[in-house]
């Protein structure tokens, strides 16, 4: 029995770790290599999954992107390896391989999960993981889970995550075995005879610390460490985005979002008197009279010329979900996706250089109806305390004229706090998903179909029409063109089958266009049609294969169509002025006529000085500070990192959308001043609660 016992004891002792600095460093490096391979594999998966965006970009560009990405991956790997580096101070800690394997497996599994999730996130938003993730998590969990379950291959991703986590655990276990020295222990305790003394381990730690600091900084230059802009080394926005690390991007967004001092709010960069005067020069026109100038930035009395008004009584704003300009036939889009909107454009006035102020429905709603821009730190204005401020939108201006109102929507008004926000602004009648009886189709995620919404809209408009009735304004908002693109069966339009990953999106857009066409076909038979101004506008666009500049203008460019009696006779059929959603309210008020006091952050696009090409200030969703100002054929992009120089692009929309960088553009300084002045002054007005028709605080 002595020999078997001795053999058993020998095997047990051989399984115990005799920690050495050399073996521990080898283990750390091998584990780091496993994580680096995982991040490169995730980057490759992101590239392959979104391969439609490659277009004619050469392979060398993506090789450069992957090389750039290694530096960001290495930064995260260094962070995850900190416990292993600290273990150099203790022989017992170095021996705790089981704990290290557990930590690395859990941390890498989380990063793997985020990487898998990011493949569809990027396809949808053309951005790496950012503050939008937290915004969706913050919303109604039932709706979010329903959207994910019905809109994305959740089971497939969960299986891939489980298999990937298992493989990672095997890889870390293999790294442990490959670097585990074997030696006898006395009494089962850790021997320290082969472990370097503490001062030697301290010296090794200092060397490792220096190496890790350099690796985490990502650069040997003096000054700031590697920034996200350092990956923007190619002409392809897709390739540049690939160079980022989604986990790091999400962590940065979390830090910004959870910052107690709200670091993501725009900070003043200019003297306020200068910024305010610049904004006034941008917005106050010849028919405006500035009022309350010592308190309010751009509050003014506007009297539109009588010859530019229209014989209208009512106003109907139709906010179309994800109605992207790049797929509208009248704007040069292929595939016959919007035949009804294309035909409607022949009887109205179509703006072909129009943009949403943001890339989320939330921003489209308050920009279009409340006439307030999308600002850094206030992308979800309607859910913030500042969202309770009285602004200067259509509800305030038309309620003051004793207009009746109605807001018809497929979904739940609680989702973006629409009912709270718009009722506070002056609206009184809300028709949401729970108010529809026997709808043609109801989606468990979002609500009823667009055709149901439009049919109910017809009922509500007719109920408000009549000789003895008040004039009315209405907001009709569609929703079917949103993930998971649940549509009625049988579908009244032909499915799109030749656009790859965009097939479902474009099919839903074609359906929304059909529903819009049915609405107008029925509405034009009603008496109110001949005395109503209809505004059809997209809440935002969506990305496709072509990313126009790093701002991805396809996500912002939307149609804006005005239909009203006599509009073509006075203003023509096509308008090339640059505008955004915050220009809609003053443009409406200009057609109604009569003096109005407002503080809109846009202008009447049909009463601009001769030769004025218009402008627009835009910002993508998320918590970052990247913003841009658009002119007739140029766009200046101001990166979120204030230390980085802005970029000027010359862009083109229509049948051949593209953008190219303009080196040393002469208007860079001018447009940057205008953009920063606009953001700074609008932010100050909102925080000071002086952005409305009247002050929200005592003088």
Q: Where in the sequence are the language-model features?
A:
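Residues that form generic nucleotide/phosphate-binding pockets
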Residues: 69, 73, 147, 170, ...
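Soluble catalytic regions of membrane-associated enzymes that act on cell-envelope
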Residues: 218-599, 608-614, 619
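Intrinsically disordered, low-complexity coil segments
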Residues: 12-16, 178-199, 463-471, 568-572, ...
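Transmembrane and membrane-interface helices of multi-pass
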Residues: 2-264
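Extended, compositionally biased low-complexity polar/Lys-Gly-rich tracts
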Residues: 191-208, 212-215, 472-480, 489-491, ...
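Short loop/turn microsegments at loop-to-beta-strand junctions
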Residues: 61, 507, 558, 624-625
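Conformational gate/switch positions in structured elements
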Residues: 119, 151, 322, 540, ...
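Membrane-interface soluble catalytic domains
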Residues: 7, 16, 225, 568-699
């Amino acid at each position: 029995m002595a020999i078997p016992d001795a053999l058993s004891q020998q095997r047990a002792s051989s399984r115990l770790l005799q920690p050495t600095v050399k073996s521990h460093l080898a283990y750390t490096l091998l584990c780091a290599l496993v994580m680096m391979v995982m991040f490169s594999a995730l980057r490759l998966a992101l590239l392959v999954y979104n391969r439609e965006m490659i277009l004619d970009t050469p392979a060398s560009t993506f090789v450069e992107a992957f090389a750039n990405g290694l530096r960001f991956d290495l930064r995260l790997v260094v962070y995850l390896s900190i416990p292993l580096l600290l273990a150099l101070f203790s022989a017992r800690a170095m021996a705790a391989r089981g704990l290290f394997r557990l930590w690395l497996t859990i941390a890498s599994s989380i990063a793997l999960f985020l990487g898998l999730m990011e493949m569809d996130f990027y396809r949808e938003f053309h951005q790496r993981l950012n503050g939008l993730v937290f915004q969706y998590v913050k919303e109604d969990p039932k709706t979010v889970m329903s959207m994910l379950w019905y809109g994305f291959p959740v089971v497939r991703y969960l299986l891939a995550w489980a298999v990937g986590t298992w493989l990672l655990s095997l890889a870390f276990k293999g790294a442990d075995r490959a670097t585990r020295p074997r030696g006898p222990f006395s009494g089962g305790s850790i021997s320290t005879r082969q472990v370097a003394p503490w001062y030697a381990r301290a010296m090794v730690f200092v060397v490792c610390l220096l190496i890790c600091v350099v690796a985490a900084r990502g650069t040997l230059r003096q000054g700031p460490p590697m920034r996200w802009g350092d990956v923007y080394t190619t002409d392809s926005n897709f390739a540049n985005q690939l160079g980022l690390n989604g986990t790091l991007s999400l962590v940065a967004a979390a830090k910004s979002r959870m910052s107690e001092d709200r670091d993501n709010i725009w900070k003043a960069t200019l003297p306020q008197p200068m910024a305010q005067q610049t904004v006034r020069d941008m917005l106050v026109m010849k028919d405006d009279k500035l009022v309350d100038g010592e308190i309010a930035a751009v509050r003014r009395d506007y009297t539109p010329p009588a010859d530019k008004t229209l014989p209208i009584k009512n106003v109907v704003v139709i906010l179309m979900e994800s109605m992207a300009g790049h797929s509208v036939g009248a704007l040069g889009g292929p595939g016959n996706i919007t035949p009804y909107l294309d035909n409607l454009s022949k009887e109205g006035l179509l703006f072909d250089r129009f943009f949403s102020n943001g890339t989320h429905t939330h921003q489209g709603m308050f920009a279009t109806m409340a006439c307030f821009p999308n600002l850094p730190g206030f992308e979800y204005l309607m859910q913030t305390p500042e969202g309770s401020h009285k602004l200067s939108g259509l509800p305030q201006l038309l309620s003051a004229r004793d207009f009746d109102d109605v807001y018809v929507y497929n979904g739940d008004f609680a989702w973006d706090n629409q009912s709270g926000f718009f009722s506070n602004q002056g609206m009184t009648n809300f028709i949401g998903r729970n108010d529809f009886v026997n709808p043609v189709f109801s989606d468990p995620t979002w609500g009823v179909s667009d055709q149901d919404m439009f049919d109910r809209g017809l009922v509500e408009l007719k109920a408000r029409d009549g000789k003895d009735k008040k004039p009315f304004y209405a907001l009709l908002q569609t929703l079917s063109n949103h993930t998971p693109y649940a549509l009625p069966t049988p579908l009244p339009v032909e499915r799109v089958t030749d656009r790859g990953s965009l097939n479902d999106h474009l099919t839903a857009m074609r359906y929304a266009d059909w529903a819009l066409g049915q609405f107008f076909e029925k509405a034009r038979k009603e008496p109110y049609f001949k005395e109503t101004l209809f505004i059809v506008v997209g809440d935002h666009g969506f990305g496709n294969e072509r990313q126009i500049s790093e701002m991805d203008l396809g996500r912002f460019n939307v149609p804006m169509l005005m239909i009203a009696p006599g509009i073509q006779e006075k203003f023509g059929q096509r308008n090339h002025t640059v505008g955004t959603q915050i220009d809609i309210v003053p443009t409406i008020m200009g057609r109604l006529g009569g003096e109005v006091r407002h503080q809109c952050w846009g202008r009447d696009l049909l009463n601009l000085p001769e030769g004025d090409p218009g402008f627009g200030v835009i910002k993508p969703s998320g918590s970052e500070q990247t913003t841009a100002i658009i002119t007739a054929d140029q766009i200046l992009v101001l990166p979120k990192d204030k230390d980085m120089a802005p970029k000027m692009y010359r862009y083109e929309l229509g049948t051949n959308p593209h953008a190219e960088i303009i080196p040393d553009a002469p208007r860079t300084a001018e447009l940057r001043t205008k953009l920063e002045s606009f953001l700074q002054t609008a932010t100050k007005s909102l925080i000071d609660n002086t952005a409305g028709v009247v002050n929200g605080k005592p003088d």
